Amino acid sequence: SPLEPVYPGDNATPEEMAQYAAELRRYINMLTRPRY
């Protein structure tokens, strides 16, 4: 199963936050995708 992305912290750079947001979206999509 996919691993939950780790929050980079309040001092993260905008690039790190964007990467985290993208990984989190992908993670949630994998969790909520219907399994046929």
From Swiss-Prot:
Gene Ontology terms: cellular component: extracellular space
GO biological process: feeding behavior; neuropeptide signaling pathway
Gene Ontology MF term list: neuropeptide hormone activity; neuropeptide Y receptor binding
The family this protein is said to belong to: Belongs to the NPY family.
Organism whose genome encodes this protein: Ceratotherium simum
Name under which the protein is recorded: Pancreatic polypeptide
SMART domains documented for this protein: PAH (SM00309)
Secreted is among the record's keywords: yes
Keywords: Amidation, Hormone, Secreted
Record's function text: Hormone secreted by pancreatic cells that acts as a regulator of pancreatic and gastrointestinal functions probably by signaling through the G protein-coupled receptor NPY4R2.
Residues the record lists as Tyrosine amide modifications: Y36
Transmembrane segment boundaries: none
Record CDD domains: PAH
Keyword Secreted: yes
Predominant localisation class: secreted
Top-rank taxon, per record: Eukaryota
Annotated compartments: Secreted
Name of the gene this protein is made from: PPY
Pfam family, one: Hormone_3
